[in-house]
Design a protein with these regions (language model features):
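Positively charged, polar, low-complexity stretches
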Residues: 1-105
């Protein structure tokens, strides 16, 4: 029997004007209710994004209001972590991770 994804969304709306990696980590921890053991580093972010077992909704949306003001290197790392985390959920039949950024005009 195949379990279907619960289509109820969990929206993590990421605030604007995040100035650095520390602010981004704090915002993600707050909006995604990361556990107390979250280490506020890239490895810990990837681990938590690939778990999210504490969120019961089936569709988890991380919506950015703007692009975080990170260094080019940190922005690349963040993008790669998000892509890898999304990919890690591809075969999961009960959850789906969606990440949104504003369209650049």
């Amino acid at each position: 029997m195949t379990t279907k994804i619960n289509q109820t969304p969990y929206l993590a709306l990421i605030k604007e004007e995040l100035k650095d990696k520390d602010e981004l980590m704090e915002e993600l921890k707050l909006k995604l209710n990361f556990p107390d053991y979250f280490g506020s580093n890239w490895d810990a972010l990837f681990d938590c994004l690939c778990d999210l077992s504490w969120i019961h909704e089936g569709v988890i949306i991380i919506k950015h209001r703007d692009i975080p003001k990170l260094s080019i290197q940190d922005l690349e790392i963040y993008k790669d972590i998000l892509q890898d985390a999304i990919y890690s959920w591809n075969d999961d039949e009960t959850h789906k991770l969606i990440v949104e950024f504003p369209t650049l005009s």
